[in-house]
């Protein structure tokens, strides 16, 4: 099972639905859920930190990003929380994104395996990662956001600023499937 920490984002149920379409069991839990509660459940194979409107109300997400031994994917606010937890800088975007945008993948990697180097994704945010932590690499960018996706250099921790769970995002199902593979789920190819 994948647990989705609910940070109050408008698309949190779409994350669960997208995983259901992949036949991956998922459960939405409050963002007050602790790392200890997650670690105590052997059915949980990965964690998704959802989007949301307020970084100050994302209770336990930074602790989970820093200390979880399970794979973690941050989406939108979740992506920003991961970066902030590791010493990155998050602030108001130069240009707010509420539209379909072009994403450019810098190089093939495990999160974007099977995804072309350029694709359209849905973005909906006012803040963004401005400085990436040293222990992360930038996987993708757009014309108006230099950090659309990141990966920890040693752990299975990923972040995407855009929304792979929204139907407007091309290859969003493949991106989510690739994360689920990192969590140990198998898929027939």
UniProtKB/Swiss-Prot annotation:
EC number: 6.3.5.2
Domain Glutamine amidotransferase type-1: from-to ranges: 1-189
GO-annotated molecular function: ATP binding; GMP synthase activity
Enzymatic class: ligase
Catalytic reactions on record: XMP + L-glutamine + ATP + H2O = GMP + L-glutamate + AMP + diphosphate + 2 H(+)
CDD domains hit by this protein: GATase1_GMP_Synthase
Keyword ATP-binding attributed: yes
Active site: 76 (nucleophile), 163, 165
HAMAP family per the UniProt record, alphabetical: GMP_synthase_A
NCBIfam families per record: guaA_Nterm, PRK00758.1
Role: Catalyzes the synthesis of GMP from XMP.
Protein name according to UniProt: GMP synthase [glutamine-hydrolyzing] subunit A
Native species: Methanococcus maripaludis (strain DSM 14266 / JCM 13030 / NBRC 101832 / S2 / LL)
Lineage: Archaea, Methanobacteriati, Methanobacteriota, Methanomada group, Methanococci
């Amino acid at each position: 099972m994948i647990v989705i920490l609910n940070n109050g984002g408008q698309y949190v149920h779409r994350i669960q639905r997208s995983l259901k379409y992949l036949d991956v069991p998922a459960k939405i839990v409050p963002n007050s859920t602790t790392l200890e509660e997650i670690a105590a459940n052997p059915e949980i194979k990965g964690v998704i930190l959802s989007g949301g409107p307020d970084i100050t109300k994302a209770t336990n997400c930074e602790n989970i990003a820093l200390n979880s031994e399970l794979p973690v994917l941050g989406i939108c606010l979740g992506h920003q929380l991961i970066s902030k937890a590791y010493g990155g800088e998050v602030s108001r975007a130069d240009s707010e994104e509420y539209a379909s945008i072009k994403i450019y993948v810098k190089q093939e990697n495990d999160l974007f395996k099977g995804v072309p180097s350029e694709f359209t994704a849905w973005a909906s945010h006012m803040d963004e990662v401005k400085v990436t932590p040293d222990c992360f690499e930038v996987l993708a960018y757009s014309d108006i956001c230099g950090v659309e996706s990141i990966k920890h250099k040693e752990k299975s921790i990923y972040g995407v600023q855009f929304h792979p769970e929204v139907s407007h995002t091309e290859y969003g199902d493949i991106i989510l499937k690739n994360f689920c593979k990192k969590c140990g789920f198998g898929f027939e190819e």
